[in-house]
Amino acid sequence: PLTILATGGKSYPGTGSDGSGYALAAAVGHTIIPPRPSLVPIICENTDKQFTTLMGLSLRNVTLNLIQKKTGKVIYSELGEMLFTHFGISGPLALTASSYMDVPTDYRITIDCKPGLTPEQLDARMLRDFEGSPNRAFGNALEALLPHSLIPVVVAKSGIPAERRVNPLTRE
């Protein structure tokens, strides 16, 4: 017969959850499955200084994708809410995604801020917005689409100067 021995984890020694139950189980011959963090915020290794400007930004109705670096396989993808913190990301999406991670450095995360739109629909929406205000600067033209604190990061990642007028911009 199989035996499940529930002795708590080892995440909070102050409460008695110090991992001693694993040693007890191993001593009597049980196979131990190494524990790993689950339902925890995700610490992001990111050298991009702009990332820290997002601290405190809460996003709703976004899709978080957890992608295995080696294979490019999407391990987790869900629509919901998340929060940028001083160390990475938190909130319901991040907490759930963390339970899918074996070795944290083996993954990358993407966030789709407009999951209800296909890439083609997003292109069309942006071009339509740009045509409506052709003399607006690129950075300002994104205000209808993104939270204010996210705009400088998106502008920097796009390679398009924030002050460039949107009238000559195309899908390319």
Regions found by a protein language model. Give the residues of each.
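An anion/pyrophosphate-binding glycine-rich loop and adjacent beta-alpha core
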Residues: 30-36, 40-169
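Short hydrophobic core segments
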Residues: 1-17, 25-26, 82-87
